[in-house]
């Protein structure tokens, strides 16, 4: 390994260390709570070193949004994609999302729920990045439902966009109430609601949705 390669590798490790902390801070306190000085102090790094990695507070925020999206994909989207297209994949996607929130992958619950509340009325690159993440997620839920309909496991007259909206609303409400009240009852209610909506849309070709305990 050359000296340059070693510096690049160390820089990448430091960047991941910093981003591991920024997603935690932002999920609880918001993206505006991120500062180079705070991160340098908490992680025992030099301010100049942290600044060199990101260049500005805005780039630090954008990198944090990208890292949160990467983690979300790894924990929710990718595992759900391992289930064959159909009602089972729709159910698994929702289950994984609820577990991602309930298990506090990010200590403040769903990272993007908080980021949307923080940046919904603002303008600029960070707002736009949060919007893209939200649209990508909604589109993925719709696509998963559409695949189930194409596979013959959901009724042909299923309003895909409406069903996706309702499932996302149930998941996000469970997240919000759980974080606010520090309890998990809302997750069961969300699972009951999701199961009911998916069963209502399913055809006889679909595997049965498990009963919610």
Regions found by a protein language model. Give the residues of each.
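C-terminal peripheral helix-coil segments that are non-catalytic and often amphipathic
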Residues: 1-5, 92-99, 135-151, 170, ...
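Basic, helix-initiating cap at the start of DNA-binding domains
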Residues: 1-29, 33-42, 59-62
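Short hydrophobic/aromatic patch on the recognition helix
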Residues: 43-54
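Alpha-helical DNA-contacting segments of helix-turn-helix folds
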Residues: 54, 59-68
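Hydrophobic alpha-helical connector segments
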Residues: 63, 77-108, 160-167, 209
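All-alpha amphipathic helical-bundle segments outside canonical DNA-binding/catalytic cores
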Residues: 88, 128-133, 150-166, 185, ...
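Amphipathic alpha-helical segments used for helix-helix packing
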Residues: 89, 104-125
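Hydrophobic alpha-helical segments that form the core
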Residues: 108, 113, 140, 156-177, ...
């Amino acid at each position: 390994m050359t000296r340059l390669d070693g510096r690049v590798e160390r820089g990448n490790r430091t960047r991941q260390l910093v981003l591991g902390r920024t997603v935690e801070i932002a999920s609880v306190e918001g993206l505006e709570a991120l500062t180079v000085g705070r991160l340098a102090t908490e992680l025992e790094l030099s301010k100049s070193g942290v600044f060199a990695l990101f260049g500005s507070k805005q780039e630090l925020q954008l990198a944090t949004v990208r890292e949160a999206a990467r983690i979300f994909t790894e924990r929710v989207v990718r595992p759900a994609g391992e289930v064959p297209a159909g009602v089972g994949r729709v159910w698994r996607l929702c289950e994984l999302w609820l577990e991602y929130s309930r298990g506090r992958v990010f200590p403040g619950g769903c990272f993007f729920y908080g980021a949307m509340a923080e940046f919904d009325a603002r303008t600029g690159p960070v707002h736009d990045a949060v919007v893209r993440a939200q649209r990508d997620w909604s589109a993925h839920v719709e696509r998963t439902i559409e695949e189930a309909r194409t596979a013959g496991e959901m009724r042909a007259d299923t309003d895909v966009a409406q069903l996706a909206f309702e499932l996302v609303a149930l998941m996000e409400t469970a997240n919000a109430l759980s974080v606010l009240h520090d309890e998990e009852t809302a997750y069961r209610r969300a699972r009951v609601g999701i199961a009911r909506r998916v069963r209502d849309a399913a055809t006889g070709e679909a595997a049965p949705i498990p009963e919610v305990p």
